[in-house]
Amino acid sequence: MMPLAMAKTGETVIIRKITGRDDVRQHLAELGFVVDSQVTVVSEAAGNLILQVKDSRIALSKAMATRIMF
């Protein structure tokens, strides 16, 4: 498994695991980051990743993206 922060722009991956404290995992789940869901890296800007999750685009810091494994 690799962290989402390592995915390249345009790449679509399937989330396999989310690490971190319960509150962090809950927050990510509320944003749509759940195991077995697809995420597409739209772009990278200023240390953040712009991600397509379901029908939404979400900016996520690289630090937070390291907690999401694919």
Say what each PLM segment does.
Residues M1-F70:
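Compact, glycine-rich, soluble single-domain proteins
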